[in-house]
Amino acid sequence: MTNSNKVLKLGLPKGSLQDSTLDLFAHAGFHFSVQSRSYFPSIDDDELEAILIRAQEMAHYVQLGAFDVGLTGKDWIIETDADVVEVADLVYSKASMRPVRWVLAVPESSPVKTVKDLEGKHIATEVVNITKKYLAANGVNASVEFSWGATEVKPPDLADAIVEVTETGSSLRANKLRIVETILESNTKLIANRQSWEDPWKREKIESMALLLQGAINAQGKVGLKMNAPKSALEKITSIIPALRQPTVSHLANDQWVALEVIVTEKIVRKLIPELKRAGAEGIFEYDINKLID
């Protein structure tokens, strides 16, 4: 079998993570096209076959070998007790570039202050196994019921407390719920089937994918700046650039001038560019960065 007809089976998360995942892959250089109601995206890489499936099931199917590689949360790996290779941490979520939290929450009016106060109470959640382990670790005996969704509406009539995932806590506050404790922080992970990981071609393909995806995450919120400057202003200019690394300085044909290139955080650019101009920089050029590889 030649490399030209080898294929890596990729599982992509369907649902809340779908759009942010496809956007991340696009920045990494993999462009998917998803037709309405289709679970089989097309991709501009003949060595990849992708299927959309719920993140909750991903680790299970990667373990079975239905997928060589997939993306899911640390939470679902733990919840399903899946035996997979955790290739890379990809810290992004539905609406932000940060981890999510599974939290224990109760109605604002509830007397519950800690998990200990839930002895003999009823808890609703999607992560039954994680919740049971958490209760056991705290010596609490409470009943845990699987929730099919809309978990925030269940207290106080259908449950005394819930364990729910949140990025900002806004949905919980909107439903008049109060966070008692954080049970687990979770982020997206690139995971691989153990047999696939032992295949040299598949492993190299997976590692390359991980490198590009991590590079796309590293580049989020960053831009590049290029500019020319007289040597006499170089020290002043470099002193005001809060760079991720020291600027790259290149000599120009005019030996009294240099070219500078630097990567900075995008949110400071509107303040930084006028300062650079006043310090003597010319020909300032800002450009987007898709990937930043360490």
Swiss-Prot record:
Keywords assigned by UniProt, alphabetized: Amino-acid biosynthesis, ATP-binding, Cytoplasm, Glycosyltransferase, Histidine biosynthesis, Magnesium, Metal-binding, Nucleotide-binding, Transferase
Gene3D superfamilies in the record: 3.30.70.120, Periplasmic binding protein-like II (3.40.190.10)
CDD domains assigned: PBP2_HisGL3
Necessary cofactors: Mg(2+)
Organism: Chlorobium luteolum (strain DSM 273 / BCRC 81028 / 2530)
Domain of life, source organism: Bacteria
Family of this protein: Belongs to the ATP phosphoribosyltransferase family. Long subfamily.
Keyword Transferase included in the entry's annotation: yes
Catalytic activity: 1-(5-phospho-beta-D-ribosyl)-ATP + diphosphate = 5-phospho-alpha-D-ribose 1-diphosphate + ATP
HAMAP family reported in the protein's UniProt record: HisG_Long (MF_00079)
Entry's Gene Ontology cellular component terms: cytoplasm
Primary role: Catalyzes the condensation of ATP and 5-phosphoribose 1-diphosphate to form N'-(5'-phosphoribosyl)-ATP (PR-ATP). Has a crucial role in the pathway because the rate of histidine biosynthesis seems to be controlled primarily by regulation of HisG enzymatic activity.
Protein name per its UniProtKB record: ATP phosphoribosyltransferase
Description of activity control: Feedback inhibited by histidine.
GO biological process, one term: L-histidine biosynthetic process
Listed PANTHER family: ATP PHOSPHORIBOSYLTRANSFERASE, ATP PHOSPHORIBOSYLTRANSFERASE ATP-PRTASE
Entry coiled-coil feature ranges: none
Primary location: cytoplasm
EC annotation from Swiss-Prot or TrEMBL: 2.4.2.17
Molecular function terms from GO: ATP binding; ATP phosphoribosyltransferase activity; magnesium ion binding
Keyword DNA damage: no
Pathway noted in the entry: Amino-acid biosynthesis; L-histidine biosynthesis; L-histidine from 5-phospho-alpha-D-ribose 1-diphosphate: step 1/9
Location within or outside the cell: Cytoplasm
